[in-house]
Each structure stands twice: as C-alpha cells, then as structure tokens.
Amino acid sequence: MTDLNKLVKELNDLGLTDVKEIVYNPSYEQLFEEETKPGLEGFDKGTLTTLGAVAVDTGIFTGRSPKDKYIVCDETTKDTVWWNSEAAKNDNKPMTQETWKSLRELVAKQLSGKRLFVVEGYCGASEKHRIGVRMVTEVAWQAHFVKNMFIRPTDEELKNFKADFTVLNGAKCTNPNWKEQGLNSENFVAFNITEGIQLIGGTWYGGEMKKGMFSMMNYFLPLKGVASMHCSANVGKDGDVAIFFGLSGTGKTTLSTDPKRQLIGDDEHGWDESGVFNFEGGCYAKTINLSQENEPDIYGAIRRDALLENVVVRADGSVDFDDGSKTENTRVSYPIYHIDNIVRPVSKAGHATKVIFLTADAFGVLPPVSKLTPEQTEYYFLSGFTAKLAGTERGVTEPTPTFSACFGAAFLSLHPIQYADVLVERMKASGAEAYLVNTGWNGTGKRISIKDTRGIIDAILDGSIEKAEMGELPIFNLAIPKALPGVDPAILDPRDTYADKAQWQVKAEDLANRFVKNFVKYTANPEAAKLVGAGPKA
C-alpha cells in the first residue's frame, strides 16, 4: 500500500495522531543508515560488526515473556481459544476489553507525534492461507527485523496490500496500571483477534513480533483444516519433503539446513491440501557457540542485512559467538535468501513423507532415534517432551525437563488435540512416517554429537533406516535400529551408554512416570484417552 494519506488516516483511526513522518517499507540500505546513524542511544542503537551485520541489544528482555502474554476474551475467542486454567496451564491468559482499551491508548500515545517505520509483509507463503501484517514501530532495527522475518511483498502485491493484522510495537512504554488490572507486570504482549491487532509494551525482544503472528496463524489455520506447525522443513532432489518438529535449541534450524536438500523454512510452517509452506521470509537462528566449521550455512548468512541480537561485540567490531554473558539465547535474523540452498521463488513444496520429532532429553533415557507407530506419533506429538535449554525464556538457565504440547505449547491458541488431528490427517493422506530423534544427552553425560545426529537424519531421509534390523526399548516400547550407516552403533541403544544398565532403568522409570502424569490432562478427551497405551509403561 503506497497511498500514505490513506495509511495516516488508518493510523489515526487506531489513535496514532500527529505522525511526523512515515518511513514506509524502507530498503535494507535505508534501514542500515537509520539503525547505525550517529546520536542513537540505548537499545535504539545498532553497532556495525566486522561480518557486515548490525548488532543490537534488547536489555533484560533476551527471550520471550510468556507470563506477559494475553488474548482479549470476547465473543470471537471465548469458546475457541485454549485458555489458561488450573488443569491445563498455558500462556493464553484472558484480558478484558476494558484493559485492552487502556493498553491500546497507552501504545497509541507512545507512537503519536513520532517519526514511524511501517513495514508491510505476509505471514504465510500460501496465497490462500497467508495473512497480511502491518508492523508499526518508532525503532529502525525493529523494522529491519520484520523485513527480515516476514515475506516481502512484490511491488504489485503492495499496491493491493490488505493488513489483516496490525502490530503496534510500543517497546518504550510500560503499563503503570498493571497491578489494578490484575496483570503479571508492567510489560505486555496482547492480542485482540476480533480487531486484528497485537500490542507490545516494555519488551524489546525481536522474537515477540515474529512469534506473535505465529500464535495468530495457530489460531486461524487449524479452524480451516490446515496444519499449523512449529517445525522446520526441507525438500530433497526428488521432491521428498521432511518436517522437523522441536522446541528452541533442539536442532530444528541446524538439522534442516542441509547441503543435500533445499530449505523450505526453519521454524514455522503450514500444511494444506497442496503441501507444506513456510510462514516466514527469513530465519531466526541461535548463535551461541556458532562456528564456521560446524554450521557454515548459518555462519555465512551473517553478513550485511542480517541483524544480530545480544551478541558480544569486541572493540574491533568482531563478534565473540562463544560469549553468553548477556544471554545464552543470542540470535541472528536474516532474509531466507542468505541461505543459498533454498526453495525458490516461493518457500513451499509438496506433501511431507517424513515427520521428525526432535527432543533434547536431559535425563539420558531416550534413544537417539526410534520409529513411531501412528498411535505413538500422536502420543509423542501431544506430549511434546524436551528439556528447556538455557536462555530461550527469561529465568531459565539450566536444562530442565518440560512437556510442551505439539512441540510448541507457548504458541498454541487452540486446544492441542486440534493440531494433532489435522497433522495426523495430513500424514495419513501422504503416507508419511514419523520418527523420534533425541539430540540431547545419554549415559556418558555428554550431548549426542551433531555428526551422529546428522547420520541419523540422513538414514531417515535416504530410507536406510527402513532396512535396519530393529530392536525394542523396554518401558517406552520404542522400535530402535541396531545399526545405521555413519552412526556410532554404541549409542543407538541408550542402555549401552551406561556403565551400569540398572542406572538407565531407574531414570527410565522416572521419566516414564512424568510422561504418564503429563498425559492425564488429555484423557478427558475420548480420542486422546485411547492413546494412553501408546505411551511408556510407568
């Protein structure tokens, strides 16, 4: 949309008055000048690094703030949203329309009388299922982040652009009335699905803008029978599509970035009647301990137009990727075309035939790979077990076990069974097989090597795992291969990694109990109750 008068009027309608200037869909060149210009202070300021990318800091907000997330409860949402409750704790806390109105006025006041950046883009590479997103901010690098992460419209598309959702980023304002309103803190990330607006206040973390729209896709798509997934995806030379589910830090980005396959996307996808499509126009990769040797594609993507968050920049402008003193959750966003080996011109492909669940097991119990039955697929998808890894959320620094429904509970707007149903339906139609891959720890106390995990993924994708002789892991009743090409055979049965196998047994019984306890919350649903037998035997 290039009619700025119309845009100003639409912003006025949202309460943003006396707008000094609109910098509309700025080019990368313009953003670079804006975010590095002399005189910028605090978190507005970008620092040029020797890699060519600009680095910014987000202060104490080095991860998402799930405790500050709210959805307005109204006629649209009261019976559809998976609301937080004692029985099922989640991040979808209801907000009254009165509180929403006061927050909207607060953010509008913050953005009024300012020079504003407005970036318009799409969430979703499927023309049928995408949503048009308009991002409004007073901070240049936030506009840069959005330009990197959302799908950049063509000039033709911009002429007829329709904003289905508007994000008002008021990172510089906080809510003084939070206590009286019964909120968690002065910071807020709030959604009004009826109005099509997201408000951000207090937090500077870039990921709030990206994950906010993911939560909205997770609301709209399953209601239309389209799978909405927290996964990465790639496609082989023969058009075979694989999707990788997993929470942050389990290897979604690393393992789907594969020189032998084209990347569809690294984090958020839909799966409709035509196939798998990316929601995003960029990647948001973790950079802690990043090296050119281990992750050449991601390292090579960190150049001009990439945006680094919370990394340590030395006095000479070089980046110390091993320094986690600000946060373990250091990040980089870059447009997807910074990776050479991607699906072009549109990030979408056919139906998936391999579905991989990545988990980082902090207990050292689960095998590096197991093949799942259809019932186990649904059970482990609903369980979404992993270990939360350091620093992806504020206040989490040590690996702790967690169960996150559908490998993305933080972003689910509907009940988990709705996502499981749509996924299983899509898998049945395409004849897809599912595998559970543990990228975490084993009895040696060490993390399973990337080399071995890559060997496992190769065996899944090239079909050699189907030819392997299989054994069974007790308690979990998982089918595990006895040997795979290029993988250390000593790690395939986790019991073999313990000096004393009885130790594995004790830990396995403990973990099995946790699975059973966690799954109780689903058993009120008759469909989910049938899956109990597919889980471990405590």
From Swiss-Prot:
InterPro entries to which the protein is assigned, alphabetical: PEP_carboxykinase_ATP (IPR001272), PEP_carboxykinase_C (IPR013035), PEP_carboxykinase_N (IPR008210), PEPCK_ATP_CS (IPR015994)
Bound cofactor: record note: Binds 1 Mn(2+) ion per subunit.
Source taxon at top rank: Bacteria
Metabolic or biological pathway: Carbohydrate biosynthesis; gluconeogenesis
EC number annotated for this UniProt entry: 4.1.1.49
Residues the record lists as binding ATP: 152, 211, 230, 246-254, 295, 331, 344, 447-448, 453
GO MF annotations in UniProt: ATP binding; metal ion binding; phosphoenolpyruvate carboxykinase (ATP) activity
DNA repair is among the record's keywords: no
Protein name per the record: Phosphoenolpyruvate carboxykinase (ATP)
Annotated organism of origin: Actinobacillus succinogenes (strain ATCC 55618 / DSM 22257 / CCUG 43843 / 130Z)
GO CC field: cytosol
SUPFAM superfamilies per UniProt: PEP carboxykinase N-terminal domain (SSF68923), PEP carboxykinase-like (SSF53795)
Subcellular location: Cytoplasm
Function: Involved in gluconeogenesis. Catalyzes the conversion of oxaloacetate (OAA) to phosphoenolpyruvate (PEP) through direct phosphoryl transfer between the nucleoside triphosphate and OAA.
Family in the record: Belongs to the phosphoenolpyruvate carboxykinase (ATP) family.
Binding site for substrate: R64, Y205, K211, R331
